[in-house]
């Protein structure tokens, strides 16, 4: 949670956030978790103090999302004293100033990658000039070439062919931190947008008084609030699980890695949702600024450019969507979770849902809705698994639809939990409004992707029955969303800010 909070705070800096995140995350954590005693003594203290700067060398020209297909090779010398590395890495953050590289390559004809610790000053390391990027221009991004680079055989990190596992485990951490890392940028754009909309006069009125602008501000705020909710919920769940594992006798490193792997789906959700709401927020920020938003003189251009990379690094959002559903399928087949059994129960029952809303018990009614939405997920998940069997992984459109349903349910439930907690603490009615806005938007997403999923492979009669069930699961109270959005916008326009430490009093 500490590292997530720091990522949250520095996220507004864009380029510095990228450099900081690459160094403290993917460049340092492999050594923390997989380095031996000698490696940690030699390198880890310097990385932690900042005396050494690190970079992570995984991506290659022909291996991006398919990271384990990398062509870089390491050959053990005849006397077994050193490895000789050859290969090319690209899009390496911090490449221009890093002192230490975590390099992934295959030994001989191994199937899987191995990780190596490589010092920058060695002969045979060459770099291209800095990449001319769309955004995060203040960060260093280089191509790095390794030509017969000799490293001591003691600089193998972890075990042979363990590199892909190291890469995945470290990326899980990077994903949840990226979710938190977008928040500072979102808040900064929201604050600029609030203040500009109050100052900008058109038709003799501040544009903040217009419904179209209030709609934008409300959605920017609610989505950011929801992103905070999922990140700190997932972070706390991981922290609690780490403590449980430690109480059972596992050491800290083992406890952290096991807990993070257990919550890999939540890490992917945070990454996907965070990066996409950042794009949404900065885009609406430019729109609120109008023509000025398109100028480099205004505070919108840089966030707009910087935001785009977040949907690509730490695994593209498409790959992460596949990971969410693929992980659940894998765990279900191993009987680690009983999703298949629950899905079959929902499908067999097949009764249409009817959720009764009570304004006197808003949150209880809302949780009843969440349970109904979970049945909707189980239904489409089970139907797809039954239809495609082991071929479902080739049906990426269906998997992405299912992933979007999962994401929206997690986002909505997390938002409701946080709204309820704050509301019970101080009875601030804005929490009711935020929860209503989240319900409205997430129901629409869930209904859309659920229907799109089933009609992509069902015949007309089966599709109609499924759509009836989906509609019953997603039918809820018709809130006056116009007034809800206006109330939310007015609340924060009066405050003149959306702050991380806002106590909502």
Language-model features: where?
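Glycine-rich beta->alpha junctions and the first turn(s) of the following alpha-helix
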Residues: 126-228, 239, 263, 268, ...
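C-terminal amphipathic alpha-helical interaction region
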Residues: 350-505
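A short core secondary-structure module
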Residues: 81-127
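Gly/Pro-rich turn-and-neighbor structural signature
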Residues: 57, 219-282
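Charged, glycine-rich active-site and insertion segments that engage polyanionic ligands
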Residues: 259-292, 432-450
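Internal helix-loop-helix
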Residues: 1-50, 93-100, 224, 228, ...
């Amino acid at each position: 949670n500490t590292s997530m909070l720091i990522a949250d705070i520095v996220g507004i800096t864009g380029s510095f956030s990228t450099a900081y995140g690459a160094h403290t995350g993917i460049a340092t954590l492999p050594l923390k978790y997989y380095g031996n005693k000698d490696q940690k003594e030699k390198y880890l203290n310097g990385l932690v103090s900042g005396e050494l700067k690190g970079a992570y060398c995984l991506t290659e020209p022909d291996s991006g999302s398919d990271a384990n297909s990398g062509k870089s090779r390491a050959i053990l010398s005849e006397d077994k004293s050193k490895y000789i590395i050859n290969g090319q890495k690209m899009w390496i953050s911090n490449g221009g100033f890093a002192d230490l590289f975590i390099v992934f390559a295959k030994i001989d004809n191994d199937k899987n990658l191995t990780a190596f610790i490589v010092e920058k000053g060695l002969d045979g390391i060459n770099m291209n000039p800095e990449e001319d990027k769309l955004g995060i221009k203040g960060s260093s991004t280089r191509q790095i070439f390794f030509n017969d680079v000799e490293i001591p055989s003691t600089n193998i990190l972890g075990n042979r062919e363990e590199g892909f596992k190291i890469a995945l485990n470290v990326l899980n951490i990077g994903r949840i931190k990226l979710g938190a890392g977008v928040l500072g940028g979102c808040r900064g754009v929201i604050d600029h947008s609030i203040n500009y909309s109050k100052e900008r006069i058109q038709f003799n009125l501040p544009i903040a008084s217009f419904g179209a602008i209030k709609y934008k501000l409300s959605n920017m705020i609610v989505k950011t609030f929801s992103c905070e909710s999922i990140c700190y919920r997932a972070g706390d769940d991981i922290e609690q699980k780490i403590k449980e594992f430690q109480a059972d006798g596992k050491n800290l490193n083992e406890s952290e890695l096991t807990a993070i792997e257990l919550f890999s789906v939540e890490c992917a959700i945070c990454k996907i949702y965070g990066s996409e709401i950042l794009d949404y927020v900065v885009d609406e920020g430019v729109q609120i600024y109008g023509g000025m938003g398109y100028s480099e003189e205004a505070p919108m251009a840089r966030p707009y450019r910087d935001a785009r990379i977040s949907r690509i690094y730490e695994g593209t959002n498409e790959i992460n969507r596949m990971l969410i559903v693929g992980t659940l399928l894998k765990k279900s087949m191993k009987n680690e979770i009983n999703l298949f059994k629950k899905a079959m129960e929902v499908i067999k029952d097949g009764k249409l849902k009817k959720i009764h809303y009570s304004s006197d018990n808003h949150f209880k009614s809302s949780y009843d809705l969440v349970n109904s939405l979970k049945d909707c997920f189980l239904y489409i998940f089970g139907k797809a698994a039954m239809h495609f069997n082991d071929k479902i992984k080739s049906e990426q459109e269906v998997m992405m639809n299912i992933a979007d349903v999962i994401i929206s349910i997690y986002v909505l439930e997390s938002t409701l939990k946080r709204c309820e907690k704050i509301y019970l603490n101080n009875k601030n009615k804005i929490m009711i409004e935020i929860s209503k806005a989240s319900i409205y938007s997430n129901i629409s997403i869930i209904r859309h992707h659920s229907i799109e999923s089933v009609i992509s492979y069902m015949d007309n009669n089966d599709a109609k029955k499924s759509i009836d069930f989906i509609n019953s699961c997603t039918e809820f109270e018709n809130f006056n969303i116009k007034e809800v959005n206006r109330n939310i916008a007015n609340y924060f326009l009066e405050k003149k800010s959306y702050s991380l430490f806002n106590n909502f009093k």
